[in-house]
Amino acid sequence: RGFTLIELMLVVVIISALAAMVVPRLAGRTEEARRSIAAADIKGNLSLALKLFEVDNGRYPTAEQGLGALLQKPASPPVPKNWKGPYLEQEPLDPWGKPYVYRQPGTHPPRDYDLSSLGPDGVESDDDVKNW
């Protein structure tokens, strides 16, 4: 005995209703997960790489040198004398595929630098993820 068309359609309607309830909840979690990844990158990997650079060279990279100074020895002054990098394996991009924003000197104590992700909209706004 097979299923009738009505029974199959009822199953499809039930599955669609369940999907309609679950998908919006998962969509919000994706953005939340990206924000968590950006915060972990900023407070973890990138801060550690910047600290290692500072320990080796006695200072953080300048704003002009940027986070690229963690990948290859900067040629612009002040050229680090004791560069032992690379301090990162690849160019750091936030979960939205954009470069992290690095400012040195920082304007938010107690850090000597400001590090942030501009978030999903890619502009400075309330959705940014910051190290301060």
Residues of each region from the PLM?
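N-terminal single-pass transmembrane signal-anchor helix
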Residues: 1-26
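A residue-level detector for conformationally permissive "hinge/kink" positions
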Residues: 8-12, 50, 77, 89
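Generic secondary-structure boundary signal with a strong preference for alpha-helix termini
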Residues: 14, 31-32, 109-110
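Short amphipathic alpha-helical leader/targeting segments
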Residues: 16, 40, 111-112
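Conserved hydrophobic/amphipathic alpha-helical signal-anchor segments
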Residues: 22-76
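Periplasmic/extracellular, small/polar-rich flexible segments of pilin-like filament-forming proteins
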Residues: 55-132
